[in-house]
Amino acid sequence: MTAQKEDFWGRFAGTFDNDQRYIVGEDTPKAILEELSNEQSLGEVVEFGCGSGFFTRALTNNSKSVVATDLSDEMLEMARHKFQGIQNITFQKANCKSTDFPAEAFDTAVMINLIHVIENPLDSLLECHRILKTGGKLVIASYTAYSMSLLPRIGMIMRFLKKWGKPLPYFNPKLSSDHLSVLLKKAAFVIEESKIIGDKTKALYLRARKE
Protein backbone atom coordinates (compact mmCIF):
# COMPACT_ATOMS: atom_id res chain seq x y z
CA MET A 1 0.00 0.00 0.00
CA THR A 2 2.94 2.34 0.64
CA ALA A 3 4.11 1.92 -2.95
CA GLN A 4 0.58 2.63 -4.18
CA LYS A 5 0.49 5.95 -2.32
CA GLU A 6 3.98 6.88 -3.50
CA ASP A 7 3.09 6.17 -7.12
CA PHE A 8 -0.24 7.99 -6.89
CA TRP A 9 1.24 11.35 -5.87
CA GLY A 10 4.64 11.06 -7.54
CA ARG A 11 3.16 11.13 -11.03
CA PHE A 12 1.82 14.65 -10.37
CA ALA A 13 5.09 16.12 -9.04
CA GLY A 14 5.73 18.34 -12.05
CA THR A 15 2.31 19.99 -11.98
CA PHE A 16 1.39 19.61 -8.30
CA ASP A 17 1.51 23.28 -7.28
CA ASN A 18 -0.60 24.43 -10.21
CA ASP A 19 -2.99 21.50 -9.78
CA GLN A 20 -3.47 22.39 -6.13
CA ARG A 21 -4.32 26.00 -6.96
CA TYR A 22 -6.74 24.84 -9.65
CA ILE A 23 -8.55 22.50 -7.26
CA VAL A 24 -8.82 24.66 -4.13
CA GLY A 25 -8.14 28.15 -5.49
CA GLU A 26 -5.57 30.73 -4.39
CA ASP A 27 -7.06 31.92 -1.10
CA THR A 28 -6.99 28.77 1.02
CA PRO A 29 -3.33 27.89 0.34
CA LYS A 30 -2.47 31.51 1.16
CA ALA A 31 -4.42 31.22 4.41
CA ILE A 32 -2.44 28.11 5.38
CA LEU A 33 0.84 29.84 4.51
CA GLU A 34 -0.12 32.81 6.65
CA GLU A 35 -0.93 30.59 9.63
CA LEU A 36 2.37 28.73 9.25
CA SER A 37 4.31 31.98 8.99
CA ASN A 38 2.79 33.09 12.29
CA GLU A 39 4.00 30.00 14.15
CA GLN A 40 6.87 31.11 16.38
CA SER A 41 9.95 29.39 17.85
CA LEU A 42 9.60 26.14 15.93
CA GLY A 43 13.11 24.96 16.77
CA GLU A 44 14.15 21.71 15.09
CA VAL A 45 11.33 20.85 12.66
CA VAL A 46 10.32 17.72 10.79
CA GLU A 47 7.77 18.05 8.00
CA PHE A 48 5.95 14.95 6.80
CA GLY A 49 4.43 14.89 3.32
CA CYS A 50 6.34 17.95 2.12
CA GLY A 51 5.39 17.16 -1.48
CA SER A 52 6.90 19.68 -3.88
CA GLY A 53 7.76 22.02 -0.99
CA PHE A 54 4.86 24.41 -1.53
CA PHE A 55 4.36 25.04 2.21
CA THR A 56 7.90 24.26 3.37
CA ARG A 57 9.31 27.74 2.86
CA ALA A 58 6.95 29.15 5.51
CA LEU A 59 8.69 26.94 8.08
CA THR A 60 12.27 28.00 7.39
CA ASN A 61 12.13 31.55 8.78
CA ASN A 62 10.99 30.62 12.30
CA SER A 63 12.99 27.43 12.82
CA LYS A 64 16.57 26.39 13.50
CA SER A 65 16.38 23.65 10.91
CA VAL A 66 13.81 21.77 8.84
CA VAL A 67 13.94 18.13 7.78
CA ALA A 68 11.35 17.91 5.01
CA THR A 69 10.24 14.37 4.15
CA ASP A 70 8.04 12.62 1.64
CA LEU A 71 7.50 9.12 0.27
CA SER A 72 7.76 10.23 -3.35
CA ASP A 73 11.20 10.53 -4.96
CA GLU A 74 9.68 12.72 -7.67
CA MET A 75 8.21 15.14 -5.14
CA LEU A 76 11.49 15.33 -3.23
CA GLU A 77 13.37 16.09 -6.43
CA MET A 78 11.03 19.01 -7.16
CA ALA A 79 11.37 20.30 -3.60
CA ARG A 80 15.17 20.10 -3.57
CA HIS A 81 15.29 22.12 -6.78
CA LYS A 82 13.19 24.88 -5.21
CA PHE A 83 15.35 25.17 -2.10
CA GLN A 84 18.84 25.16 -3.57
CA GLY A 85 21.11 27.39 -1.50
CA ILE A 86 18.92 27.48 1.61
CA GLN A 87 21.12 26.27 4.44
CA ASN A 88 18.71 25.26 7.20
CA ILE A 89 16.68 22.70 5.26
CA THR A 90 17.35 19.11 4.22
CA PHE A 91 15.17 16.65 2.34
CA GLN A 92 14.88 12.91 2.79
CA LYS A 93 12.56 10.05 2.01
CA ALA A 94 10.55 8.86 5.00
CA ASN A 95 7.31 7.13 5.91
CA CYS A 96 5.45 9.23 8.48
CA LYS A 97 4.16 6.09 10.20
CA SER A 98 7.58 4.56 10.84
CA THR A 99 10.78 6.59 10.65
CA ASP A 100 14.42 6.10 11.58
CA PHE A 101 14.48 9.29 13.64
CA PRO A 102 15.44 8.84 17.30
CA ALA A 103 12.92 9.45 20.05
CA GLU A 104 12.43 13.06 21.13
CA ALA A 105 14.52 14.40 18.23
CA PHE A 106 12.36 17.36 17.21
CA ASP A 107 10.69 20.42 18.69
CA THR A 108 7.96 20.62 16.03
CA ALA A 109 6.29 18.20 13.61
CA VAL A 110 4.29 19.52 10.67
CA MET A 111 1.79 17.71 8.44
CA ILE A 112 0.20 19.77 5.67
CA ASN A 113 -2.46 18.12 3.49
CA LEU A 114 -1.33 14.69 4.57
CA ILE A 115 -3.46 13.41 7.45
CA HIS A 116 -6.59 13.07 5.27
CA VAL A 117 -4.89 11.13 2.46
CA ILE A 118 -3.11 8.39 4.42
CA GLU A 119 -4.33 5.04 5.66
CA ASN A 120 -4.56 4.60 9.45
CA PRO A 121 -3.64 8.21 10.31
CA LEU A 122 -3.39 7.40 14.02
CA ASP A 123 -0.14 5.56 13.26
CA SER A 124 1.40 8.77 11.93
CA LEU A 125 0.29 10.72 15.01
CA LEU A 126 1.82 8.10 17.30
CA GLU A 127 5.09 8.39 15.37
CA CYS A 128 4.99 12.17 15.72
CA HIS A 129 4.52 11.73 19.46
CA ARG A 130 7.53 9.40 19.62
CA ILE A 131 9.94 11.74 17.83
CA LEU A 132 8.78 14.97 19.47
CA LYS A 133 10.34 16.27 22.66
CA THR A 134 8.09 16.59 25.70
CA GLY A 135 6.08 19.76 25.15
CA GLY A 136 6.82 19.62 21.43
CA LYS A 137 4.43 21.15 18.94
CA LEU A 138 2.38 19.39 16.25
CA VAL A 139 0.92 21.51 13.45
CA ILE A 140 -1.63 20.00 11.07
CA ALA A 141 -3.42 21.62 8.16
CA SER A 142 -5.59 19.77 5.65
CA TYR A 143 -8.01 20.78 2.96
CA THR A 144 -11.49 19.57 3.82
CA ALA A 145 -14.96 19.64 2.33
CA TYR A 146 -16.31 19.65 5.88
CA SER A 147 -18.41 22.79 6.50
CA MET A 148 -18.32 23.75 2.80
CA SER A 149 -21.63 24.57 1.15
CA LEU A 150 -22.92 22.12 -1.44
CA LEU A 151 -22.06 23.81 -4.75
CA PRO A 152 -18.46 24.76 -3.85
CA ARG A 153 -17.98 21.24 -2.48
CA ILE A 154 -19.19 19.63 -5.71
CA GLY A 155 -16.99 21.98 -7.72
CA MET A 156 -13.89 21.10 -5.71
CA ILE A 157 -14.57 17.38 -6.06
CA MET A 158 -15.01 17.69 -9.82
CA ARG A 159 -11.76 19.65 -10.16
CA PHE A 160 -9.95 17.01 -8.10
CA LEU A 161 -11.24 14.22 -10.32
CA LYS A 162 -10.29 16.14 -13.45
CA LYS A 163 -6.69 16.69 -12.35
CA TRP A 164 -5.89 13.64 -10.23
CA GLY A 165 -8.58 11.08 -10.97
CA LYS A 166 -10.14 8.69 -8.46
CA PRO A 167 -8.54 9.08 -5.01
CA LEU A 168 -7.09 6.25 -2.97
CA PRO A 169 -9.76 4.27 -1.07
CA TYR A 170 -8.87 5.65 2.37
CA PHE A 171 -8.90 9.31 1.27
CA ASN A 172 -11.04 11.34 3.71
CA PRO A 173 -12.30 14.48 1.92
CA LYS A 174 -14.48 15.63 4.83
CA LEU A 175 -12.07 15.47 7.74
CA SER A 176 -13.63 17.25 10.72
CA SER A 177 -12.03 18.82 13.77
CA ASP A 178 -13.99 16.39 15.97
CA HIS A 179 -12.61 13.35 14.14
CA LEU A 180 -9.05 14.65 14.26
CA SER A 181 -9.41 15.60 17.92
CA VAL A 182 -10.31 12.01 18.80
CA LEU A 183 -7.20 10.72 17.02
CA LEU A 184 -4.95 13.28 18.70
CA LYS A 185 -6.22 12.39 22.15
CA LYS A 186 -5.53 8.71 21.45
CA ALA A 187 -1.97 9.71 20.54
CA ALA A 188 -1.61 11.69 23.83
CA PHE A 189 -1.61 15.17 22.32
CA VAL A 190 -3.28 18.18 23.91
CA ILE A 191 -5.01 20.45 21.41
CA GLU A 192 -4.16 24.14 21.74
CA GLU A 193 -6.11 25.48 18.77
CA SER A 194 -8.37 24.05 16.09
CA LYS A 195 -10.19 26.07 13.45
CA ILE A 196 -11.53 26.06 9.91
CA ILE A 197 -9.90 28.59 7.59
CA GLY A 198 -10.60 29.62 4.01
CA ASP A 199 -13.52 31.13 2.13
CA LYS A 200 -15.12 29.11 -0.67
CA THR A 201 -12.82 26.16 -0.05
CA LYS A 202 -11.80 25.19 3.46
CA ALA A 203 -8.89 23.83 5.44
CA LEU A 204 -8.68 22.50 8.97
CA TYR A 205 -5.81 24.10 10.89
CA LEU A 206 -4.78 22.63 14.23
CA ARG A 207 -1.98 23.01 16.75
CA ALA A 208 -1.33 20.50 19.54
CA ARG A 209 1.33 19.70 22.14
CA LYS A 210 2.90 16.46 23.28
CA GLU A 211 2.06 15.72 26.89
Predicted stretch roles:
Residues 108-121:
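A short SAM/SAH-binding and catalytic strip from SAM-dependent methyltransferases
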Residues 187-189, 193-211:
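Core SAM-dependent methyltransferase catalytic element
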